[in-house]
Regions:
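Hydrophobic core of transmembrane alpha-helices in multi-pass small-molecule transporters
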Residues: 14, 76-83, 95-119, 123, ...
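C-terminal ends and interior cores of transmembrane alpha-helices
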Residues: 77-96, 303-317
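Central cavity-lining transmembrane alpha-helices of secondary-active solute carriers
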Residues: 42-63, 269-284
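Helix-loop boundary and gating motifs at the non-cytosolic
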Residues: 1-52, 223-259, 266-267, 339
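A membrane-interface helix-boundary motif in multi-pass transporters
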Residues: 159-180, 380-412
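Multi-pass alpha-helical transporter architecture, strongest
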Residues: 57, 85-91, 181-194, 368, ...
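C-terminal transmembrane helical hairpin of 12-TM major facilitator-type secondary transporters
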Residues: 296-342
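Juxtamembrane intracellular "pre-TM" segments in multi-pass secondary transporters
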Residues: 1-3, 193-229, 254-259
């Protein structure tokens, strides 16, 4: 039974993250190729905007009204249909893609995909706890397979080509891939073990309790408030490389020295090293949490972001490719030691009644407010130092990319130093705040 439960959750994580991996790191190149390079940040910011309210809202629904595993499937179904519609529009529009219709369908898709990140974590935690597992020890190895799914989807769209020889990573076909995977998740979720709504309604409940807003009471605890604020500040960094790493590496195609390099031609495959590193990073989390505690683990993540951005600025697909590779390797620690450890920390500090809502709140601060500010600010920086060049090979963003990445590295360094000074680690990690 124990092996069966783990296997079910492994499959869930593979599908969950493959749906995102199909386009997350390559969408920027497609947008640039159809003349929407100056609006890449808006597309990625939309993921943050919907994360401001949708994860919290869906967390409340899962706590109060619809079992979490069924709600997870419903969200994937809506997301998959909308993403498939976006792909169909891209196919019919060709090179005459208009911003409004593509963005509208994409926005609807991510509005229902983003809450599934927190929901899938909640479903896994609940099923593991119901079967007597220690989530801190058992969940990270399961979550590793989510990254495996993400990598497989990335590599699929990198190497798969359409009839005209265009890689999926540079076309609307990445959206088709994501849509089909999400629809598969819809079916799979309805076969998962039940995760009943845990919150009870009663006449004595306050309005905040009835609508699941009690998770915001976590801000009454000074340390948790600081934790959530810095989650937002570090969340600024999360989507920057997702949105701009592929256009950055691909732009070397129009730089004579690097035009024929393997990295410039296969940006998504090069970036996939980041996800391989993420897989290994997840396995280190239980050990790191035990040895260092949440503060040091998050500090490691913050300084890893400094290296991630700084090495991007110094590297290239030629003699400097080793710096790009190290940057990809560092990403595993930068992402996992913040996202996964932070989610586990929230789970340990909250009771079952509001855990879904608390995970939604964490998602709001990181992938919501933080990522929105980050992607819009990053787009402004990119627009300041780069410009679009139309070539026979397509549209590319060229300019002073080095300065762009050094600015991002400087920001991450400031956040790390402030967190080191202000955050105090709790003496009892398992003491419930709410």
């Amino acid at each position: 039974m124990n092996k069966s439960i783990r296997l079910r959750l492994i499959v869930m994580n593979i599908i969950q993250w493959a749906a995102w991996g199909a386009y997350l790191t390559s969408m920027g190149s497609y947008l640039a190729s159809v003349g929407l390079g100056a609006r890449i940040g808006i597309f990625y910011a939309m993921q943050g905007i919907v994360s401001i309210f949708m994860p919290t809202l869906m967390g409340i629904v899962a706590d109060k009204f619809i079992p979490a595993q069924k709600l997870l499937g419903i969200c994937h179904g809506i997301s998959g249909v909308a993403m498939t519609a976006a792909a169909f529009y891209g196919m019919t529009a060709g090179t005459d893609v208009a911003f409004a219709p593509l963005f509208a369908m994409y926005a609807l898709s991510v509005a229902f995909y983003m809450p599934t990140i927190a929901l899938s974590n909640s479903v896994a935690y609940r099923i593991l706890e119901n079967n007597g597992f220690d989530t801190v020890k058992v969940f990270p190895p399961i979550r590793v397979f989510g990254t495996v799914g993400f990598i497989c989807a990335m590599l699929f769209v990198n190497f798969m080509k359409d009839g005209a020889g265009v890689q999926f990573q540079n076309s609307y076909n990445q959206f088709f891939t994501s849509g089909v995977i999400s629809l598969a998740m819809l079916v799979y979720c309805f076969t998962l073990p039940a995760c009943p709504c845990t919150a009870t309604s009663g006449e004595n409940e306050s309005l905040a309790e009835r609508f699941g807003l009690k998770a915001f009471s976590l801000f009454k605890d000074k340390n948790m408030a600081i934790f959530f604020i810095f989650s937002m500040l570090l969340g600024v960094a999360l989507q920057i490389t997702n949105g701009f790493a592929n256009p950055y590496i691909s732009h070397f195609k129009v730089v004579d020295e690097f035009a024929t390099s393997w990295g410039a031609e296969n940006a998504n495959a090069l970036i996939s090293i980041s996800q391989v590193s993420e897989t290994l990073g997840i396995l280190l989390i239980p050990i790191a949490m035990k040895l260092f505690g949440i503060k040091r683990v998050m500090l490691i993540a913050m300084f890893a972001w400094v290296l991630r951005f700084g090495l991007f600025g110094a590297g290239n697909p030629g003699p400097g490719v080793w710096m790009l590779i190290i940057s990809m390797i560092v990403y595993g620690v930068a992402f996992d030691f913040f996202n996964i450890s932070g989610s586990l920390y929230v789970n340990m500090r909250t009771s079952g009644k509001i855990q879904n809502s608390a995970q939604g709140l964490f998602m709001l601060m990181t992938n919501g407010i933080g990522a929105t500010i980050g992607t819009l600010s990053a787009q402004a920086v990119v627009n300041k130092f780069t410009h679009t060049v139309d070539t026979a090979a397509g549209n590319f963003l060229v300019g002073d990319w080095n300065t762009v990445w050094y600015i991002f590295a400087g920001y991450a360094l400031v956040v790390a130093v402030l967190f080191m000074i202000l955050f105090k680690e709790p003496k009892n990690m398992n003491e419930k705040i709410a």
